[in-house]
């Protein structure tokens, strides 16, 4: 059974589940209801605020508590569709006896080799942790970052969490995208909240969606357990 530790943020859960369902159709031809995997989905509230620093101890505790509760339901492995939570990946995995997929590793696999200039869009804690930048630089890719881009991403994430946000968030995204596209040949969406906007836009340069990469790996791992 697939375990999904979701709710970070709440609006990222349903797009992730949709992507898992899509990959069931793409990877093994699921069509009838009975063809889809058993999934245990636990939406775990966490003390994340887009406008203030994270209390890492409280954040880590909330996620580990959620992961342990999810494991007790009998899941075979866990997918956690939240990039910021992967700052604590080692501690979370140590608290579990089942494996947890790593969203960064799965996302990096999908980056095309010709890409040389990457922009990583994520929360302040994700960017500050450099969990993407370290791997990208190790692969010979330049990571471009500007402080005012980060401020715009922070505003975008905060706006997504509000009701009836689409018109406002698409305008915020368009302004940010127009500048980023002049500097980068690939964008990495390292925040699953951004799917609320990015799933509905077109881009002339590739956007690597960490949520989709994790969903693909979730289904591939499920199939490996079935074989």
Curated annotation (Swiss-Prot):
Its EC number is 5.1.1.10. Optimum pH is 8.5 with L-lysine as substrate. The active site is at 82 (proton donor/acceptor), 191 (proton donor/acceptor). Pfam families: Asp_Glu_race (PF01177). Optimum temperature is 37 degrees Celsius. Substrate binds at residues 51-53, 83-85, 161. It is an enzyme of class 5 (isomerase). Keywords: Isomerase, Sporulation. It comes from the Bacteria. One of its GO terms (molecular function) is diaminopimelate epimerase activity. One of its GO terms (biological process) is sporulation resulting in formation of a cellular spore. InterPro entries: Asp/Glu/hydantoin_racemase, Asp/Glu_race, Asp/Glu_racemase_AS_1, Asp/Glu_racemase_AS_2, Asp_race. It catalyses: an L-alpha-amino acid = a D-alpha-amino acid; (2S,6S)-2,6-diaminopimelate = meso-2,6-diaminopimelate; L-lysine = D-lysine; L-arginine = D-arginine. Belongs to the aspartate/glutamate racemases family. Homodimer. Amino-acid racemase able to utilize a broad range of substrates. Preferentially catalyzes the epimerization of LL-diaminopimelate, as well as the racemization of D-lysine, L-arginine, L-ornithine, L-lysine and D-arginine. Has lower activity against D-ornithine, L-histidine, L-alanine, L-tyrosine, L-phenylalanine, L-serine, L-glutamine, L-methionine, L-asparagine and L-homoserine. Has weak activity against L-norleucine, L-aminobutyric acid and L-norvaline. Has no activity toward nine L-amino acids (Thr, Glu, Asp, Val, Leu, Ile, Trp, Cit and Aad). This is Broad specificity amino-acid racemase RacX.
